[in-house]
Design a protein with these regions (language model features):
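A short amphipathic helical element positioned immediately N-terminal to and/or at the very start
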Residues: 1-9, 78, 82
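Short, strongly hydrophobic transmembrane alpha-helices
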Residues: 7, 11-41
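Short, conserved clusters of charged catalytic residues that mark active-site
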Residues: 15, 34, 38, 73-81, ...
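Membrane-proximal extracellular/periplasmic loop immediately following the first transmembrane helix
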Residues: 32-104, 112, 215-217
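Solvent-exposed, non-transmembrane alpha-helical starts
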Residues: 65-76, 111-116, 145-149, 188-200, ...
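Short strand-coil-strand connectors
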Residues: 103-110, 175-177
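Mid-to-C-terminal secondary-structure elements
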Residues: 122-139, 149-217
Length: 217
């Protein structure tokens, strides 16, 4: 130890550079490991990462020459015809989220509002992902099938609009359309990229389902 301290004292600049370089290398390794863990390990609400298959894009070829190729996200017709009927799957859910077009969530009097990211999904979503509900619960299968405008909101949205997380049964607006709040969940980490949103509503409330016709969406 004394010899090491003596060497550091003899060439302070080189010693500082060596120490900082070693510390930076260790920090970079730690960051890489942390990013790998948060993108692969299971944690709430994405507790089933290790046994979940994600289908995010589909490729289509031209019928005649097989040369015209296109890639896009899945359309609802393809999900209904090919994914929902899968017998080997414990649960199948469809998620439609426009990360580039958040909606304005507001109180009924319009005095409080918050730009929020919306996830359009189905009832199986709440089986695949495990959320911590502070009050209420997910929208029911009957509400989903009927296209009733129910919404599950995050704790931060509830606090921003109402000042409390005990808001089940109250109403709010999403881009001036009224929704009934059926559940409030703890805020979700953005690292849970598939489950993350700030408001979750049935995709059946949209006239077009949020998808194009056919296999593309």
């Amino acid at each position: 130890i004394k010899q090491a301290l003596r060497m550091i004292g003899e060439n302070k600049l080189l010693s500082v550079i060596s120490i900082l370089g070693t510390a930076l290398a260790i920090c970079m390794i730690m960051v890489i490991v942390i990013l790998y863990v948060v993108n692969t390990a299971s944690f709430k609400p994405e507790v089933n990462r290790g046994r979940t298959c994600y289908i995010t894009t589909v490729m289509s070829n031209g019928k005649d020459d097989n040369r015209r190729i296109s890639y896009s996200s899945l359309g609802l017709p393809l999900v209904k015809e090919c994914c929902y009927p899968l017998k080997g799957a414990e649960a199948v859910t469809a998620i439609n989220m426009d990360r580039y077009r958040p909606l304005t969530a507001s109180s009924m009097d319009g005095l409080k509002n918050r730009t929020s990211y919306i996830s359009y999904t189905d009832t199986a979503f709440w089986k695949v992902f495990q959320f911590d509900f502070l009050q209420g619960g997910p929208f029911s299968p009957a509400a989903f099938t009927s296209g009733i405008r129910n919404a599950v909101i995050s704790e931060s949205v509830a606090l921003a609009l109402f000042g409390t997380d005990q808001v089940v049964g109250r109403e709010m607006k999403l881009d001036f359309i009224v929704y009934n709040i059926c559940g409030v969940v703890k805020d979700v980490s953005r690292f849970a990229s598939k489950a993350w949103a700030e408001v979750w509503i049935p995709y059946t409330v949209r006239d077009d389902g949020g998808y194009q016709e056919g296999i593309n969406g």
